[in-house]
């Protein structure tokens, strides 16, 4: 009987791996370094070795393993193929990951998903949106990632770009260039790096306005802390950031009408100083029937990816 499954969240520094029961119970989790040398040529064999090593340690036969799910930091086609180069994996990409890894594992079934989409799948299965059929997750970290789940299914899109929420255009007059090459992407305003960039711009534009952050090296967390403590200029940046994000979420709500929005990533740890104005701005922009859509913190944290990867395997 196939009672077990593995979930892998492949990142640029480490791969997080979880051994699960097919019911969703996490039995054990660990990490292995991601070897990005030589365009990541050893990545898949290292993942295979990690899974096989754990199977040997636990005395598991292939016949007991339902499959291995993998979340990767790039577009995925047909739950199998990574069609482009992934920059933060040393140029690794253009692989039929499912086929290649399955062969290395002696035929164990492998399915692959974009890491942000997979994290959303984890949250809707065992996290903040448990019990929902449709939900959208936004991850606010160094960039802005996203995952869209409709009727229990990840929306990958024709080109594997479904859920690229961070690259919704929110300011067509922006002159600064996003990492994707476009101008005015949500990521430029609502990511951790975007908050810092915009805060520095506010400081430059308001040289006579007192601010506790002036003359310091600060991170996004410091901006939210300053706003919480009554700093008017930091509060202005938080208001502008949440206004932009609220507008983007309202656009998504009018497109897919989810039961819930989940917000994760390091920026989400700011708490209500982020969520309270975000909900208010969302209501201003949202279509009337969507205005009360809940916007809540994601709860699985760094484990969302391994949960979602396993969900690819165990399905309904």
Regions found by a protein language model. Name each.
Residues 95-101:
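Short gly/Ser/Thr-rich phosphate-binding loop of adenylate-forming enzymes
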Residues 81-93:
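A charged helix-plus-loop insertion that forms the helical arch/lid used to bind
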Residues 120-125, 146-148, 167-168:
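Adenylate-forming
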Residues 157-158:
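A short alpha->loop->secondary-structure connector
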Residues 161-165:
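Structural signature of FAD isoalloxazine-binding scaffolds in flavoprotein oxidoreductases
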Residues 1-67, 76-82, 101-108, 122-132, ...:
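ATP-binding/phosphotransfer module of carbohydrate and carboxylate kinases, centering on a glycine-rich
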Residues 112-121:
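A glycine-rich, Thr/Ser-enriched phosphate-binding loop motif common to dinucleotide/cofactor-binding enzymes
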């Amino acid at each position: 009987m196939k009672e077990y499954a593995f979930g892998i969240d492949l990142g640029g520094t480490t791969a997080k791996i979880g051994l699960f029961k097919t019911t969703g119970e996490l039995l054990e989790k660990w990490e292995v370094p991601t070897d990005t040398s030589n365009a990541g040529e050893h990545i898949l064999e290292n993942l295979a070795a990690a899974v096989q090593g754990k199977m040997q340690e636990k005395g598991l036969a292939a016949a007991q393993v339902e499959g291995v799910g993998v979340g990767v930091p790039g577009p995925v086609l047909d739950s199998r193929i990574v069609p482009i180069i992934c920059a933060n994996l040393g140029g690794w990409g253009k692989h039929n990951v499912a086929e290649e890894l399955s062969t290395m594992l002696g035929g164990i079934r492998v399915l692959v998903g974009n890491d942000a989409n997979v994290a959303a799948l984890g949250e809707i299965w065992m996290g903040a949106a448990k019990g929902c059929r449709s939900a959208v997750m936004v991850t606010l970290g160094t960039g802005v990632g996203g995952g869209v789940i409709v009727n229990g299914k990840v929306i990958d899109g024709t080109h594997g770009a479904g859920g690229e929420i961070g690259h919704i255009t929110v300011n067509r007059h922006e002159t600064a260039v996003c990492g994707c090459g476009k101008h005015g992407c949500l990521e430029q305003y609502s990511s951790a790096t975007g908050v810092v960039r915009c805060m520095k711009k506010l400081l430059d534009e308001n040289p006579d306005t007192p601010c506790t952050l002036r003359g310091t090296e600060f991170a996004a967390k410091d901006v939210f802390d300053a706003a919480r403590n009554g700093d008017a200029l930091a509060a202005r940046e938080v208001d502008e950031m949440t206004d932009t994000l609220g507008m983007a979420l309202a656009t998504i709500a009018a497109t897919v009408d989810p039961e819930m929005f989940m917000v994760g990533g390091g920026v989400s740890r700011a708490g209500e100083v982020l969520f309270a104005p975000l909900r208010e701005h969302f209501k201003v922009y949202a279509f009337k029937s969507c205005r009360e859509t809940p916007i809540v913190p994601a709860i699985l944290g760094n484990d969302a990816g391994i949960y979602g990867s396993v969900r690819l395997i165990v399905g309904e």
